[in-house]
């Protein structure tokens, strides 16, 4: 793929293999994803190997092998949504799959930071790198991330929302896969403004993350829905 590639406001649907990025030099940025959508892949939406990948305001959604896999490399994620309600196969992979190194140990260990984001759906939030045994001694960190699973903060997880529900506007029966937030979302105002890059101030729909005191987690700013009036 080369270096310094950028996907801005890209909407990639229904791919067989998703987007694949591999690099020999993780000190040079291979890919920046900005306010984009990688959705509905036959395998996984993103596979990055030993690459420097950045993503801001981006949705990774719906794939049977997990929506995003990172093997070693440098990973910087801010204001992203990892969601999986894939319909057509059983979901086998976690939403976020992280491998600190490749199996052969050729690559340097991963340098990963995931901030102000959401991991939610029918599969696991993260693969077993998240276990206390496996994550200790790594440079893998999560700040202000909403997880479906039960857990607690420690030296690699900071200010996270555990057993949360983002209340996506999803209706699988009607094939509606809208990963914006409903009024009751646990992701509302749970972010850290200092972790939101100025470049990510506006989401893909033009909504301002800084318009309210609290920063919402995930790719999309919560927009209040009118309350139904009693008849």
Task: Write out the residue ranges for each language-model feature.
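Predominantly extracellular beta-rich ligand-binding scaffolds that present long acidic/polar faces
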Residues: 57-180
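Bacterial Sec-dependent N-terminal signal peptides
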Residues: 1-11, 37, 52-57, 69, ...
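Surface beta-loop-beta hairpin patches that serve as ligand-binding interfaces in beta-rich domains
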Residues: 174-177, 185-231
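Right-handed parallel beta-helix
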Residues: 1-61
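Intrinsically disordered, glycine/charged-rich C-terminal tails and inter-domain linkers
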Residues: 2, 6, 32, 76, ...
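Glycine-centered loop/turn positions within well-structured domains
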Residues: 17, 44, 53, 65-66, ...
